[in-house]
Regions:
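PEST-like intrinsically disordered, low-complexity C-terminal regions enriched in Ser/Thr/Pro
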Residues: 19-28
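Long, amphipathic, charge-rich alpha-helical segments that form helical bundles/coiled-coils
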Residues: 62-107
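Post-signal-peptide N-terminal segment of Sec-exported extracytoplasmic proteins
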Residues: 32-70, 74-77
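Sec-dependent N-terminal signal peptides
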Residues: 3-12
C-alpha cells in the first residue's frame, strides 16, 4: 500500500512538472513569435525598396535578396498557419512538450534565416 501511494505521488509530481515545462515552452514559443512578427513589416518595406532596384545593373543580386526576404516571410506565414494553440489543450503533457520543442526549434531556425535575409537586404546600398 505504501508503495502504491508513493507511486501515485510520484506520478502527480511528474505531471505537475511536465505541465510547468509545457507552459514554459509555450511562453518561449509565443515570445519568439512575438519577436519575429514585427520583422514582417520590415521585410515588406525592404522588399519594396529593393523592387525599385530590380532592373538595375546589379539586378541578379537584388532579385536574390528579394527572393530571400520573400522566403523568410512565407516561412513565417506557413509556421503561423500550421501552429495551433487551441490543439495544445487536447494534448497530454508529454505530447505537448514534444510538439512545443519542435515548434521552438523551427522558430529558432526561422529567426536565423529571417535575420540573415533582413541583414543582407539592409546592408545592400540603396541609391
Amino acid at each position: 500500500m505504501k508503495k502504491l501511494v508513493a507511486v501515485c505521488l510520484l506520478l502527480v509530481g511528474c505531471t505537475q512538472a511536465e505541465e510547468k515545462m509545457s507552459e514554459e515552452l509555450q511562453a518561449k514559443v509565443l515570445g519568439l513569435h512575438d519577436v519575429l512578427m514585427p520583422q514582417t513589416e520590415q521585410i515588406i518595406s525592404l522588399k519594396s525598396k529593393l523592387d525599385s532596384l530590380s532592373t538595375g545593373a546589379d539586378s541578379t543580386h537584388v532579385r536574390k535578396l528579394i527572393s530571400s526576404l520573400e522566403k523568410a516571410d512565407k516561412s513565417m506565414m506557413d509556421w503561423m498557419h500550421h501552429f495551433s494553440v487551441d490543439s495544445l489543450g487536447k494534448m497530454d503533457a508529454l505530447t505537448k512538450i514534444s510538439y512545443l520543442k519542435k515548434q521552438l526549434e523551427a522558430l529558432k531556425n526561422l529567426e536565423k534565416s529571417t535575420d540573415s535575409s533582413v541583414h543582407a537586404a539592409k546592408t545592400y546600398p540603396v541609391k
